Each structure stands twice: as structure tokens, then as C-alpha cells.
Amino acid sequence: DVFYIGGTKVGALFGEAVVITNPNLLLNMFSLVKLHGALLAKGRLLGIQFGELFRDNLYMEIGKCAVQQAQRIKQAFLAQGYEVIVDSPTNQQFFRLPNEVMDRLKESATFELWGPRGKTHTMVRFVTSWATREEDVDKLISLL
């Protein structure tokens, strides 16, 4: 019924677009957002960047590189025998890594812990964006 589309990973300054597919939920949406303090004073300006990103499939074109690089990361981790937590077709990839591998990678790579550190393994998230270069992914893969 409701989902959101992020903007920063495709070059937007900030913000997310909320998509409501169930028209019954639209009835009081503006009032609810305003009531809970989530309405930005000039929030309509955020919509301009999404309007442009959605024109002529630009959002998908910009995001294509990020998704391709994320899939390369996933395939490299799988080839090394690491566990994929979520089989994600997006620019976000989730793995369960041995702590010694995670500790070694964090010296040279940026990623996020996706939960508390376990005794032997920890879940992590790697995220690519429009700015992720092929050579950056090559370097990460070489560290595996």
C-alpha cells in the first residue's frame, strides 16, 4: 500500500518520495504528516528533484550503475563462500561475515554493521550509489 523511494543514492540532495498506491490511505495523509511534525516547511521543493529524476526514466538510468556494482559485490562474496542474508536485487547487499574477515575489511572498506557483533560472525550491509566506481568495487573484491 505504501513504500518509499530514496533519492540520495541517485544523486538527489536529500529526501525520499513516499508512494501511496492505495487511494483510501490518501484521505488524511497530509494532515497526519503535519500532525506528527514530519512536514518540512519547504518540502514541496524536494518534489522538484524527484519530478526530474522520474522524467524519461532518469532515476532508473542513474541507479543502473549502482545496482550493477552491488551485484558484482554479491557475486564476489558468494564466490568466496560468504553467506548472503538477503538476496537483494538492489544497490544494497547484506552478508554474514566471520568477524576476522569483517575486521580486516573495515580497515580499507566502508560498510555498515547490520546488527550487533556476534561471537564469531556479524551481519553487514554494503551500499553502492551513482558515485560508486568500478575500480572501487575491484579493490573491495581484491580484499576478499
Protein language model regions, located:
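Active-site C-terminal subdomain of aminotransferase-like
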Residues: 1-90
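Conserved C-terminal alpha-helix-loop-beta "cap" of PLP-dependent enzymes
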Residues: 71, 76-144
